[in-house]
Amino acid sequence: MHIVVVGVSHRTAPVEVREKLSIPDHSITESLKALKAFSEVLEVSILSTCNRLEIYALAKDKNTGISSIKEFLSEYSGIIFEDLDPHLFCFRQEEAVLHLMKVSAGLDSLVLGEGQILSQVKKMMRLGQENQSTGPILNRLLTQSVSTGKKVRSETNLGTGAVSISSAAVELAQLKIGQEKGFDTLVSLESENVLVVGAGRMSRLLITHLKSKGCHKLILVNRNIDRALNLAQDFPDLKIVCRGLNELDENISISSLVFTSTASEVPIIDLAKIEKLNLNNKLKFIDIGVPRNISNDVKQHEFVKSFDVDDLQEVVSRNQEFRQKIAKEAESLVEEERIIFLEWWASLEAVPVINKLRSDLELIRKEELQKALSRMGPDFSARERKVVEALTKGIINKILHTPVTKLRSPQSREERQVSLKIVEKLFSLAEEDKNN
């Protein structure tokens, strides 16, 4: 069996490719079923965020397993394999384990140390378990990866003051507005007419960061107006006007800065919509939705400047040098956890031999116990029988303790193979299997 991961991220593919591979929550179950339908795939889990789509699998064969996942991704995205393959990354075995742990720790994020990815890995684990697409191997890997992410954040300073995609989006707005005014610094957003489209978690984070950067009023547009109103109630110090999506156009026309973060699978704003507004003021769009909420053609409008998640790199690079130094410490913790998982996984090779040995000894114990009890006659009480049975079980467990501990202990694969062969030969385990 082999652990593999196939996917795309902000490192390997632009947003126009990533958005076609994005798997929304309502499609996860169907996608997991499609992947499990491949005979090579034994366990599978999906991580889908604005910056990455990664499929982790336990496969019978690493090469055919990877090929199956690539086939699924090509069919799902509608991108022909020859165009998609250059954007895909593949990791096998130890590298796949290391990659997931680094992702969970925030070491592979656009924003080093960002905390949201950890909750997304937790969600991936939960969805895999709910859909019964994961088993003992991936469940163990996911659990340990989540623990690794927590450990990195608690034992290093990587997560201290870490920016997120949302905060980077706000900083990008500050930077671009400042540059228009001739500054290379982050300026206050106090004078901007701000519109936020969407009322999910990312929008909540956007509003939090907007408030900290001088914004004291904004318009919040969402398809479900009640959800927008509930979100607004969490910010009593801000003047938030809530509107339905049917009022989007008129609110764009009175805004100078628009943030979009919705779960829409198609753009909700395009050039045709903007041209109908007869804009006479400069307008900035910052779109952190994946798939994108804003069509790329809006950039053709003379009064519009539009940015997406790939443009956040300009802001992120300003803050990365300090975090790169802290990341070295975090990477050593991740490596320790990787070794622990791999040692556990390697020890599973001994399980069939251990189970066979235990089964054979248990059969002998029962046979010999029955012989002894039959000799004791009817005067031997039920309580005494229980005592003798407990005694025989204790003897078997004592006999098994040392060899089982040795077989499960950390050692190279070659050393474990030698140990397994010795045990099989001493107790004739392999010969019994052949005879059966």
Curated annotation (Swiss-Prot):
Substrate binds at T49, C50, N51, R52, S109, E114, G115, Q116, Q120. It is an enzyme of class 1 (oxidoreductase). Keywords: Chlorophyll biosynthesis, NADP, Oxidoreductase, Porphyrin biosynthesis. Pathway: Porphyrin-containing compound metabolism; protoporphyrin-IX biosynthesis; 5-aminolevulinate from L-glutamyl-tRNA(Glu): step 1/2; Porphyrin-containing compound metabolism; chlorophyll biosynthesis. GO terms for molecular function: glutamyl-tRNA reductase activity; NADP binding. One of its GO terms (biological process) is protoporphyrinogen IX biosynthetic process. Its EC number is 1.2.1.70. Pfam families: GlutR_dimer, GlutR_N, Shikimate_DH. The record marks H99 as: Important for activity. It catalyses: (S)-4-amino-5-oxopentanoate + tRNA(Glu) + NADP(+) = L-glutamyl-tRNA(Glu) + NADPH + H(+). The active site is at C50. The keyword Oxidoreductase applies. PROSITE patterns: GLUTR. During catalysis, the active site Cys acts as a nucleophile attacking the alpha-carbonyl group of tRNA-bound glutamate with the formation of a thioester intermediate between enzyme and glutamate, and the concomitant release of tRNA(Glu). The thioester intermediate is finally reduced by direct hydride transfer from NADPH, to form the product GSA. HAMAP family: Glu_tRNA_reductase (MF_00087). Catalyzes the NADPH-dependent reduction of glutamyl-tRNA(Glu) to glutamate 1-semialdehyde (GSA). Homodimer. Possesses an unusual extended V-shaped dimeric structure with each monomer consisting of three distinct domains arranged along a curved 'spinal' alpha-helix. The N-terminal catalytic domain specifically recognizes the glutamate moiety of the substrate. The second domain is the NADPH-binding domain, and the third C-terminal domain is responsible for dimerization. Belongs to the glutamyl-tRNA reductase family. NCBIfam families: hemA, PRK00045.1-3. This is Glutamyl-tRNA reductase.
